[in-house]
């Protein structure tokens, strides 16, 4: 799977074996700003400050 791994939408990388999810972390406030992106084996848990969304198709994050 290929996932974006920077805040720039045109940069991505091929994920290592076993990491079959892409994630995007978004700050919940003040403006729902994208915080980080990358590959993961399991979806990171959201917190009070950051909401994580995961997907399993190329460049979906």
Curated annotation (Swiss-Prot):
Keyword set includes Ribonucleoprotein: no
Pfam family, one: Toxin_cobra-type
CC terms in the record's Gene Ontology section: extracellular region; membrane; other organism cell membrane
Highest taxon listed in the record's lineage: Eukaryota
Keyword Secreted part of the UniProt annotation: yes
InterPro entries cross-referenced by the UniProt entry: Cytotoxin_Cobra (IPR003572), Snake_3FTx (IPR003571), Snake_toxin-like_sf (IPR045860), Snake_toxin_con_site (IPR018354), Toxin_cobra-type (IPR054131)
SUPFAM superfamilies cross-referenced by the UniProt entry: Snake toxin-like
Record localization: Secreted; Target cell membrane
Keywords: Disulfide bond, Membrane, Secreted, Target cell membrane, Target membrane, Toxin
Disulfide bonds: 3-22, 15-39, 43-54, 55-60
Record-linked Gene3D superfamilies: CD59 (2.10.60.10)
Extra facts: These two sequences have Gly and Leu at positions 25 and 27, respectively, instead of 2 Met that are found in most cytotoxins. The low toxicity of these 2 proteins may possibly be correlated with these changes.
Purpose of the protein: Has low cytotoxic activity.
The protein, known as: Cytotoxin homolog 2
Origin species: Naja melanoleuca (Forest cobra)
